[in-house]
Regions:
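Extracellular/periplasmic catalytic domains that process cell-envelope and extracellular macromolecules
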Residues: 80, 87-89, 127-132, 145, ...
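Gram-negative bacterial Sec-dependent N-terminal signal peptides
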Residues: 2-24
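Chymotrypsin/trypsin-fold serine protease catalytic domain
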Residues: 135, 139-240, 262-271
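Extracellular structured ligand-interaction cores
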Residues: 91-93, 103, 130-137, 174-176, ...
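C-terminal subregion of chymotrypsin/trypsin-like serine protease catalytic domains
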Residues: 26-60, 77, 84-100, 199-333
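Catalytic-histidine neighborhood of serine endopeptidases
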Residues: 90-91, 95-133, 143-146
Length: 333
């Protein structure tokens, strides 16, 4: 069992019981077709990239709401395939929570289990754990080519501290009108009164997605979502959804951004999820530590063909002879 210390002990925080165990899960409503949540997570059916104003109906055909009102459906393939525990924000970097210490590689692309499908394992070479918060930005051993990275939320640079967004930043509906999430693991259905919970499958078999309840409290390093699971395609993240992405639509930049990664919940009967907000300071330090600077000291090099089967590579203090083809000699072939 994991006890989080990613936030200051406010009244709200102290009343959120935090548990993060090894089994993954996601809780959704039981009165709509479950396929909605699966298709959403994989951009299938009516949830294709760029789709807007998607109507949702319950099992009796009654409308329960509209997903993505006048907003484009994001590409959710940025989450690691099948598990969804990490998100690609750079061709060689992913974001997740540092208490996810058990995974050493990720895959990206379609979630098909077709044996003819080939998926590459991108190995983690450096975990880049944040020294204070439940966040890390691991580096991968190769550049990911299957998907395009999602931009990072940059609201952290909209204030003087430069370390995190101002308090209440994600409660600004003008800037952030909509959030979505995706995750994997043991899947549950829950009735509206909360009395009936149905387990569907064990962990890591497929992804589900939808909206992450509603933002309730927002600080400089975490944001709390809570509310009614029966808000259209509401989803409540459970322990093993740790590290799964929180995507926000940034109305100022007119695009979807990675806002945070799921860190905590407050029980199978609860309704509170806390996400660690993306930490740009930690990411920039990781970039600086991983990058190598090569200095040529302003030297000048010249390479001259001598015309007799050799050439000279000349610097200010050294000359190297390099054999080349002598075009004046006829070929023996």
């Amino acid at each position: 069992m994991y006890k989080s210390n990613i936030f200051r002990p406010t009244f709200i925080a102290l009343n959120v019981a935090v548990m993060c165990a090894g089994t993954q899960a996601s809780m959704v409503r039981n009165d709509v077709d479950y396929q909605y949540f699966r298709d959403f997570a994989e951009n299938k059916g009516q949830f294709f990239i760029g789709a807007k104003n998607i109507p949702i109906f319950d099992k009796q055909g009654k409308s329960v709401g509209t997903m993505l009102p006048n907003l484009p459906m994001p590409d959710l393939h940025v989450a690691s395939r099948v598990s969804g525990v990490a998100t690609l924000f750079n061709p060689q970097y992913i974001a997740s929570v540092k208490h996810n210490g058990g995974y050493g590689s990720v895959q990206f692309g379609e979630n098909s289990n077709n044996p003819d499908s080939h998926h590459f394992d991108y190995l983690i070479t450096d975990r880049n754990n944040h020294d204070k918060y439940d966040f890390h930005s691991p580096r991968l051993h190769k550049l990911v080519t299957e998907v395009t990275p999602i931009p990072l939320n940059n609201i952290a640079f909209d204030n003087n501290r430069k370390t995190g967004p101002k308090n209440g930043a994600f409660l600004d509906k003008e800037r952030y009108p909509y959030f979505v999430r995706v995750g994997s693991g043991r899947q549950y259905l829950r009735s509206k009164d909360g009395k009936e919970k149905t387990s569907l499958t064990s962990a890591y078999n497929y992804l589900t997605g939808g909206t992450p309840l509603k933002p309730n409290s927002s600080m400089d390093n975490w944001v709390l979502f809570s509310g009614d699971l029966y808000e259209t395609l509401g989803t409540y993240g459970l322990p093993g959804d740790s590290g799964s992405p929180l995507l926000a639509y940034d109305a100022k930049e007119q695009r979807w951004v990675l806002a945070g990664v799921l860190s905590t919940f407050n029980g199978y009967d609860g309704k509170n999820n806390i996400y660690t907000i993306i930490q740009p300071d930690s990411i920039h330090r990781a970039f600086e530590n991983d990058e190598m600077t090569v200095s040529l000291n302003g030297s000048t090099y010249s390479w001259q063909n001598q015309g007799v089967g050799k050439s000279i590579l000349q610097s200010s203090n050294q000359a190297v002879e390099i054999p080349v083809t002598n075009v004046n000699v006829a070929s023996k072939d």
